[in-house]
Amino acid sequence: MTQTTHHTPDTARQADPFPVKGMDAVVFAVGNAKQAAHYYSTAFGMKLVAYSGPENGSRETASYVLESGSARFVFTSVIKPSTDWGTFLAQHVAEHGDGVVDLAIEVPDARAAHAYAVEHGARSLAEPHEVKDEHGTVVLAAIATYGETRHTLVERTGYDGPYLPGYVAAKPMVAPPAQRVFQAVDHCVGNVELGRMNEWVGFYNKVMGFTNMKEFVGDDIATEYSALMSKVVADGTLKVKFPINEPAIAKKKSQIDEYLEFYGGAGVQHIALNTNDIVATVRAMRAAGVEFLDTPDSYYDTLGEWAGETRVPVDVLRELKILVDRDEDGYLLQIFTKPVQDRPTVFFEMIERHGSMGFGKGNFKALFEAIEREQEKRGNL
């Protein structure tokens, strides 16, 4: 097992060849955007803030923009394809099911970011261009990454609209929760084919100047039956973190193999969301119908011995099936949903950090065994 951590010095940050401001949006291509928006409003406590559709001139697609803190999700479905983009989205849903089509990144200079990326080997999907409305101007560009996923580069300096030109402000679908369920996107995890993890890690190293933050291989990321490998790349400020997983050869089909089969190739596996109160988050999401992975009671029998004291009592962690991990910098609390659609593909992680910038290394075995139990129920192990 190897785990490496790299802390980028301030001088390197100042010379960052691909500066980022953070995640701009996670964009989903879905079969029914209205129903998806309602689900994430009720089950995830998100707030509908913007809309684009036939009522305001978009004849081809309907899109709903939801926010929670700094996290922004966009759900888009095709009404009737009339351009290459609409045809692509329709085919994306047909092949992959509901899934992430775009991990949009906010940058201070979209033209410079696009030029640097293309110069260093990225495939351009959209040249830098301006879009305008009464709220100001946004510069957009896009590059390809693994599978059919893209990174739209968004420069929105001075823009004060609800999302982007072409969108109008929208009223929430449901009454917002008394307490925000989550505050930000923590990281976005991609699954790629066997033998391609290092290729895509190298892509982010070259194209965006991201550094390797952590690496997980060996026994700590394997069970009796299945295994995988993972490396994490991040920008110099750690605002954007992308773990990349690939399957490893083992006795049975791993969770990565299952994803690749049912998604139809590489793509975004899960999105981790920061919360400052994971207990309230899990209680609210469970009450709204979200299903989480189960953890055996035996996990909690010795938890206090190796994880130490946390702000949440062990009996509450046991009740809610929340996992704990601790490293030299602190600890984290985390829990994973089951897939949020019928295909066993995209799911979510809720994470509460107390110093630790890790990814739950100590929980990998318990997590993977929980996923294997679900795979076995589906007949996919």
Curated annotation (Swiss-Prot):
Protein's name in the database: 4-hydroxyphenylpyruvate dioxygenase
Catalysis: reaction(s): 3-(4-hydroxyphenyl)pyruvate + O2 = homogentisate + CO2
InterPro entries: 4OHPhenylPyrv_dOase, 4OHPhenylPyrv_dOase_C, 4OHPhenylPyrv_dOase_N, Glyas_Bleomycin-R_OHBP_Dase, Glyas_Fos-R_dOase_dom, VOC
Family label: Belongs to the 4HPPD family.
Family matches, as CDD domains: HPPD_C_like, HPPD_N_like
Keyword Metal-binding: yes
Amino acids binding Fe cation: H187, H270, E349
EC number(s) reported in the record: 1.13.11.27
Subunit structure and binding partners: Homodimer.
Enzyme class: oxidoreductase
UniProt cofactor(s): Fe cation
Keywords noted in UniProt: Dioxygenase, Iron, Metal-binding, Oxidoreductase, Phenylalanine catabolism, Repeat, Tyrosine catabolism
Top-level taxon in the UniProt lineage: Bacteria
Segments crossing the lipid bilayer: none
Pathway: Amino-acid degradation; L-phenylalanine degradation; acetoacetate and fumarate from L-phenylalanine: step 3/6
The UniProt record lists the keyword NAD: no
